[in-house]
Curated annotation (Swiss-Prot):
Subunit structure: Interacts with UvrB in an incision complex.
Function: The UvrABC repair system catalyzes the recognition and processing of DNA lesions. UvrC both incises the 5' and 3' sides of the lesion. The N-terminal half is responsible for the 3' incision and the C-terminal half is responsible for the 5' incision.
GO-annotated molecular function: DNA binding; excinuclease ABC activity
Record's protein name: UvrABC system protein C
PANTHER family to which the protein is assigned, alphabetical: UVRABC SYSTEM PROTEIN C, UVRC/OXIDOREDUCTASE
Amino acid sequence: MTDLFDYKEFLKTVTSQPGVYRMYDTAGTVIYVGKAKDLKKRLTSYFRAQVANRKTETLVKNIAQIDVTVTHTETEALLLEHNYIKLYQPRYNVLLRDDKSYPLIFLSADEHPRLAVHRGAKHEKGEYFGPFPNSYAVRETLALLQKLFPVRQCENSVYRNRSRPCLQYQIGRCSGPCVEGLVSEEEYQRQVDYVRLFLSGKDQQVLTQLITRMEEASQQLHFEDAARIRDQIQAVRRVTEQQFVSGDSEDLDVIGVAFDAGLACVHVLFIRLGKVLGSRSYFPKVPAGTELSEVVQTFVGQFYLQGSQGRTLPGEILLDFTLTEKDLLASSLSELAGRKIQIQSRPRGDRARYLKLARTNASTALITRLSQQSTIHQRMKELAKVLKLDEINRMECFDISHTMGEQTVASCVVFDANGPVRSEYRRYNISGITPGDDYAAMAQVLKRRYGKALDDQKIPDVIFIDGGKGQLSQAFDVFASLNVPWDKQKPLLVGVAKGSDRKAGLETLFLASEGEGFSLPPDSPALHLIQHIRDDSHNHAITGHRQRRSKVKNTSALEMIEGVGPKRRQVLLKYMGGLQPLFNASVEEIAKVPGISQALAEKIHNALKH
């Protein structure tokens, strides 16, 4: 039992209402979040002579304080619990580590709605459909919709500045609402309605409405309209016949689970509109001694309740595990979605086959991850031995990228005991330095990264600096000047200098800013890990630099041309429909823009091409 916390006095003050509790350690860090229908009964269970499992026993020993939040209902408690878990990331809770938002299809609420890919919070007014397992699935669906229903997909900035229809109109994939007279308001909204129905899985309603319109057009002797609608009907039918994998057009998530060697894999199979769109494997962080039932229960709650703002909830969730709080979770999700959501664990027919597929994928992904972890763990041990450290739990690596000193970007990548932690990768735009001064750039990024308070878990054991003794010397100077509350002596600073011909395996490592460095054998597992984190850092930096350079190039290209002022720039962009069409235009096409002579058109064309 804990000596840190007077639980008897605390329990006297606890109500029997539903609510959420947060447990803290001596450092004031939240170490566990839970919810209960009866707070008093639930919290009392932690302090019995015999606790449920080893994890609970360890947790109780570390409790120094408990805070309680009373809620009106158990459903409210469930939602609050998952919000707190996401906020505090307590170490004794099962944590869903991959919290990247899913791509969705967005149908805007503009006068002439547009279709687009969307990620993240739903700030813009409109309708959201999904989720899709990856951006490829979204792009494929948008391309399909473009062939079936001519609804615009261009950005508003392009749409508002068009004076003539673009190529998409010419090939029949947009009805051209940007130009007055090409499509009636009624017809455009009708196509938007078809998109809405199609994305909601109501293909038959789309076909029924199209058939009715075709017959009406034929009766009124509007044979061209009837033929066009007939072609649209045939296209929709071809798509639905090709892509349905079952007769069910419901939205469905199928969840398979595998568990081995303390690691869990939850594989989610996404079925939208009766089609398998794809899948994704998740590896939640599982505290030692956690039962598999708790892993599944917590994962499902976090996955849908924490991510509900970024994803469309399916009509049904299939599991290969019976949840103890299935009814509570189903009612909470139904309340959130405003419609009934079912959770099933004993499906038949096609659903049973889907579940078997999800389970198989979970097992395969788990075997692969265990194999990768074994390699990473071995490399971590070897690197710790080389650097004379007891263990390495966190490493960070920095690199600088620029072109002739312009658009300088620094990157920081993070590895933990299990390898890359991509959600913590960061880029820093560097400014206020002499162009090309890599030392100053490195000093700036290190000050920005470490010149502030850090959680103990975020302090790296090793910091790799991509560069030789000069870069490492800058790092030592920065750390010497830091005035921070955390132990700045903890990180070991290591310089990684490339070989003379920059070949992998010829790297030199420096642990001090003076003296000779040392090299590791080409087959050293420790060297392979250093190369891995160094290459990730380099790729992250150069990608960020290219994006920044491209953005600057595109926005400043016209401004650099003599004779093209703000008014002419505006006329050019409006007439051509944006910067990209202008880049692709010929001299003759540019010369057609009002106010642009043949000579100026040639100058603009040459400047943009070169």
